A protein has these predicted regions:
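Short, P/G- and charge-enriched loop/turn segments at secondary-structure junctions
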Residues: 98-104, 308-309
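Non-catalytic carbohydrate-binding regions of carbohydrate-active enzymes
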Residues: 1-3, 217-312, 329-336
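Hydrophobic core segments within long, regular secondary-structure runs in both alpha-
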Residues: 49, 53, 65-79, 112-115, ...
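Low-complexity, Ser/Thr/Pro/Gly-enriched N-terminal "stalk/linker" regions
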Residues: 1-47, 51, 57-101, 124, ...
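Well-ordered alpha-helical segments within folded domains of soluble proteins
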Residues: 39-56, 68, 106-122, 147-163, ...
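Helix-loop junctions that connect tandem helical modules in alpha-solenoid scaffolds
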Residues: 140-146, 184, 188, 196
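Extended glycan-interaction surfaces of carbohydrate-active proteins
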Residues: 1-35, 110, 116-121, 126-127, ...
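Short alpha-helical linear motifs
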Residues: 89-94, 154-157, 195-199, 296-301
Length: 336
């Protein structure tokens, strides 16, 4: 990516089996679900920063340090002077997509994920740059946010920034945003958006956000709300994913994250056990009866479709699968 600079890394959005004799095992392909979007994006790079920072902090893997630094450089390139991020690059030269429906300056999903990644950059590498970029990008998520699943990412970003820097305003912001999430429920279930049903699990991190905020900042009522939603939504979902004909890795990752974080915040083994059941979806506890994580190749496939494993293998699936599988260790949910 010459336009992004020699140190920047990005991750191809999608890959699919070649299928031709003598061809490479996988071919990269762009995102074009809503017309042509691009070849790599901030959404995936930001998730991967969290993953690689975690691997470096927890295990000291040197290649993870290098990857996190390179992906942070890509995020820096994708941030405008006013603090907003655009999502996609159109090609491997690094030309930005500034006009797509899934790629424009300041889109809430990629703005929130980029801030989460910058908070992890601050905690992992220190220095002024990632803190400055976080501060510059923050105002763009401080307005009204109808998407409570995105707001959950904002909570995790603010909370991690506070843990990295001690900035009291970030802790205050995490509490305020957590209150917004806690106020939007249908019965005990935390909503993705006010009055929007049914609940989709893709990106559903509200239990994760509330359980961690409650534990770290001493707000037990947040833990209780997260526990109630986990009981009503996530524990049933841990078994739903074992039989459902169509399931995405990101759905399972969110189930695992919420249950693992509630388990840590309550010390109740029921939630850890449920997280383990959901995590087993990657290993063959699914309607296909076949692993979605291929241990031999290291790939996570793109999920179960009509009871069969899709052999496509995109960035989101691999990153979210890795985060879910890392939840099998005693530490906090990696998404935190």
């Amino acid at each position: 990516m010459p336009l992004a600079g020699p140190a920047a890394y990005a991750i191809a959005v999608y890959a699919e089996p070649d299928g031709t004799e003598g061809g490479s095992p996988y071919l990269l392909r762009p995102a074009q679900d809503r017309s042509f979007e691009g070849v790599a994006c901030v959404d995936d790079a930001a998730r991967a920063v969290v993953l690689y920072c975690l691997l470096w902090q927890r295990y000291g893997i040197s290649t993870a340090w290098t990857a996190a630094q390179g992906l942070l450089r890509f995020l820096a390139y994708m941030q405008d002077e006013d603090g907003r991020f655009t999502n996609f690059i159109l090609d491997w030269k690094g030309r930005k997509n500034l006009t797509g429906s899934t790629s424009y300056l300041g889109g809430p999903q990629w703005q929130a994920r980029a801030l989460h990644a910058l908070a992890w950059g601050s905690s992992t590498f220190g220095g002024a740059e990632w803190h400055e970029r976080f501060t510059r990008g923050l105002p763009w998520v401080c307005g009204v946010m109808p998407y409570l699943d995105v707001r959950a990412v904002c909570v995790l970003a603010a909370l991690h920034h506070w843990q990295a820097t001690g900035d009291a305003s970030s802790a205050k912001r995490a509490i305020t945003w957590a209150e917004d999430i806690a106020a939007a429920r249908s019965g005990d279930i935390l909503l993705n958006a006010t009055s929007v049903q049914p609940i989709h699990l893709w990106g559903h991190l509200q239990e994760t956000a509330l359980a961690k905020t409650g534990r770290v900042l001493g707000r037990p009522e947040f833990v209780e709300i997260a526990l109630a939603s986990a009981e009503a939504l996530l524990i049933p979902a841990a078994d739903w994913c074992s039989t459902a004909p169509c399931v995405l890795p990101f759905e399972v990752s969110c189930i695992v994250s919420g249950l693992a974080t509630v388990a840590r915040s309550t010390e109740d083994p029921r939630y850890a056990d449920a997280a383990a059941r959901a995590r087993a979806w990657f290993l063959g506890r699914n309607s296909a009866g076949s692993p979605v994580y291929d241990h031999g190749s290291g790939l996570v496939y793109d999920g179960i479709d009509q009871g069969r494993v899709s052999r496509n293998s995109g960035a989101e699936s691999n990153i979210e699968g890795a985060l879910a599988l890392l939840c099998s260790t005693p530490q906090d949910s990696p998404v935190e």
